[in-house]
Amino acid sequence: VLLSLQSICKRLAHLGLKAHYVGEITEPAITPNDLLIVGSASGESLFPVAIAKKAKALGAKVAWIGSNQESSAAGLADYIVRIPVQSKLGRPDELKSIQPMTSLFEQSLLLYGDALARVIADRKSLDLKGLWQYHANLE
C-alpha cells in the first residue's frame, strides 16, 4: 500500500502540487491547510490509523482510501474513497481475488491515483506537455 501511496504522491507532485509522503526525509510539518491521504484496505492497520488521528489533532483534513467503510480509519476521515476489494478482514461485501492478500487493493489504489491525477489535470486545465518541468531530470 505504501508504494501505491508514494506513487500517488509522485503523480500529484508532477501536477505541480505540494505533495509529500509521511516518513520521507524532507517531510514538512502538517498544518490545518493540509490534506493527509491514508490508505488501508481494512481501515484498521495501526500506522495509517495513528497518523490519521495525529493529523486530525493538528487540524488537518484526512482522506481515507480503503475497503471497510465501518473502520476506524473511515471514522476519522473527512473524505472517503471506498475500493470494495479483498482485505485482511475477508468481509462478505468485498470483491474476492485470486491474488494473495491485498494485492488487488494495492493495484486498485495505484490506478485510482492515476485517475485522480488525470481528473485534477483536467479540472485545472493543465497542459500535459508542460508538466515535464516537474519530472525528475537527473535520470
Task: Show where each model-derived region lies.
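A short, charged, Gly/Pro-tolerant segment at domain boundaries
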Residues: A115, A121-E139
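Glycine-rich phosphate-binding loops that contact phosphosugars or nucleotide phosphates
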Residues: L2-L111, A117-R118
